[in-house]
Design a protein with these regions (language model features):
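Conserved hydrophobic residue
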Residues: 154, 215-216
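Core structural elements
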Residues: 1-2, 176, 197-212
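Short coil/turn segments at secondary-structure boundaries
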Residues: 39-47, 65, 140-144, 217-223
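Non-catalytic DNA-recognition/assembly elements of restriction-modification systems
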Residues: 7-36, 164, 168-171, 180, ...
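Proline-centric
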Residues: 15-24, 113-123, 137-139, 152-172, ...
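A short beta-sheet element
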Residues: 52-53, 69-133, 141-143, 148-150, ...
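Extended, well-ordered alpha-helical scaffold/bundle regions in very large, multi-domain proteins
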Residues: 208-209, 216-219, 232
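Sequence-specific dsDNA recognition surfaces
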Residues: 6-12, 27-40, 54-83, 103, ...
Length: 232
């Protein structure tokens, strides 16, 4: 809020997007909640393995030496992730994200947000948005970026929403370009003369083009994002 007035979306949008896109709050697209807080005194319910922020890395998980704690039936429903859920760190490396891609469910601790889409979306597109927001300091950065990711903060995050077909095309293009940014990262480790920040700048540039609707051609036959929102 600014004083007693709630800022409108128009006051907050950081860049222009194509006409077929929409600016939306993350909470409009995803049901989200955090996991269970560690409570050593709680010894009732089912003993379950769980992951913490120390298991969640960008686009991957480290699942060795998982810990266990007790979960009640209601906690299992609230704190279990399934294949396709987007997980985001609330603490630790704030905003770090990965998609749970395993065929089995897993419980989460309270410093991880579970995001589950209300309607069919390309979840990986939103993973890349978190990647971009983290790299440019809009999440967990210094200055005016969001310093923490409470439930209210993540609910209010402003994201560009392309048509679903375009979401998939953007992800396909980024995935094709990713090996080139990785190759630059390998080169920088062996060549002292190479600007060490170039791979990150290149990645940020690619992601920035993607979320502004400039990475892939616009297709007039795509169902607009507005129609996607109407189904929520």
């Amino acid at each position: 809020k600014i004083g007693d007035e709630v800022r409108s979306l128009a006051d907050e949008v950081p860049f222009d997007i194509p006409d077929s896109w929409e600016w939306v709050r993350l909470g409009e697209l995803f049901q989200h909640n955090t996991g269970k807080a560690l409570n050593a005194a709680n010894c009732t319910g089912q003993l379950k393995q769980y992951i913490t922020t120390s298991n969640l890395y960008w686009d991957r998980f480290e699942l060795d030496n998982l810990k266990e704690m007790y979960f009640s039936e209601s906690e299992i429903e609230k704190c279990t992730v399934i294949k396709g859920d987007l997980l985001v760190c609330e603490g630790g490396d704030i905003g770090r994200a990965s998609i749970w891609s395993y065929d089995y469910p897993m419980c989460i601790q309270n410093h991880i947000h579970r995001l589950r889409a209300y309607v069919p979306l390309c979840t990986r597109f939103f993973y890349y948005l978190f990647d971009l927001y983290k790299h440019i300091g809009w999440i967990g950065g210094k200055g005016i970026g969001i310093q923490g990711l409470s439930s209210n903060a993540i609910h209010s995050l402003l994201f560009p929403l392309p048509p679903l077909a375009e979401q998939h095309r953007i992800v396909e293009t980024i995935d094709k370009l990713q090996p080139y940014t990785d190759a630059y990262a390998d080169v920088e480790s062996t060549l002292d003369t190479l600007n060490t920040t170039f791979p990150e700048r290149l990645k940020k540039s690619i992601l920035q083009e993607a979320v502004q609707g400039k990475l892939v051609p616009q297709d007039s036959s795509d169902e607009p994002a507005e129609a996607l929102l109407e189904r929520i």
